Amino acid sequence: MSDAGGGKKPPVDPQAGPGPGPGRAAGERGLSGSFPLVLKKLMENPPREARLDKEKGKEKLEEDEAAAASTMAVSASLMPPIWDKTIPYDGESFHLEYMDLDEFLLENGIPASPTHLAHNLLLPVAELEGKESASSSTASPPSSSTAIFQPSETVSSTESSLEKERETPSPIDPNCVEVDVNFNPDPADLVLSSVPGGELFNPRKHKFAEEDLKPQPMIKKAKKVFVPDEQKDEKYWTRRKKNNVAAKRSRDARRLKENQITIRAAFLEKENTALRTEVAELRKEVGKCKTIVSKYETKYGPL
């Protein structure tokens, strides 16, 4: 019997139940088996949008690293290098600053002595490498060993300094010693004690010979001889003038020496008093040092 549409109904299997058929169950099993394969393909070949996002993230990370490196370089060198500057030399704006050459060489690890530098230049490459390795190996020991060796070095340095201090100093020339003495003589006396046309007399440095300090012998004056006017000829007056000049010269020399001796003696008296006061102060200091040493010896034993 046909329905209104004129079509025919498909034949119905009388044994088929209301649930799904065997074809549907087989399709579900096929889908569950192909799911891991699809996931693996997606992981190996991601979509285009995901790849673009990943590439953009990588580029952004590289840009951030480059910006950080540039900021670090700028902070490390805030000023342009000196070879980029042009310094005009006009004699006024150019100022040369002081630089300690030894300190600069020490900071850069360059030997200061030319002998050491020449020795290193003449050495072959193998020996230089051996020296560098030896220096690195000596610098690498732990801090405990350095702490052990440092006191011995300090002790040896202190012992050498003590030996140098204990050595007897070289003798001092007494002529080079100057004592601080408040001595200001009268300038007029200095002029009278100076040789005319020569240097000004210096009582601090001037020294007399032994013959100058000896008392001069008394010379008896010759008896006066009366010469009448008739015998006073030209020869007589010439001899008389020569005698007067010689007498005046001897008197001036004697007075000059007397003035020099007087001023020099005044200075020596002042210097002697100053030296006596210094010696008294030194004796006091020596007495204090002796008391300190005696107290130390009574407490800790002899030195």
UniProtKB/Swiss-Prot annotation:
Any one of the GO BP annotations: positive regulation of transcription by RNA polymerase II
Domain of life: Eukaryota
Residue numbers bearing the Phosphoserine modification: S32
Annotated keywords: Activator, Biological rhythms, DNA-binding, Nucleus, Phosphoprotein, Transcription, Transcription regulation
Basic and acidic residues: compositionally biased ranges: 41-61
The keyword Cytoplasm is annotated on this UniProt entry: no
Region (Disordered): 1-63, 132-176
Domain bZIP: start-end pairs: 233-296
One term of GO molecular function: RNA polymerase II cis-regulatory region sequence-specific DNA binding
Induction: Accumulates according to a robust circadian rhythm.
Chief site of localization: nucleus
GO cellular component entries: chromatin; nucleus
Spans annotated as Basic motif: 235-255
Biased composition (Low complexity): 133-160
Region described as Leucine-zipper: spans on this chain: 256-263
One Pfam family matching this protein: bZIP_2
The keyword Transmembrane helix appears for this protein: no
Cellular location(s): Nucleus
InterPro entries reported for this sequence: bZIP, bZIP_sf, PAR_bZIP
Cited function: Transcription factor that binds to and transactivates the TSHB promoter. Binds to a minimal DNA-binding sequence 5'-[TC][AG][AG]TTA[TC][AG]-3'.
Subunit structure: Binds DNA as a homodimer or a heterodimer. Can form a heterodimer with DBP.
Family: Belongs to the bZIP family. PAR subfamily.
Stated name of the protein: Thyrotroph embryonic factor
Protein species of origin: Homo sapiens
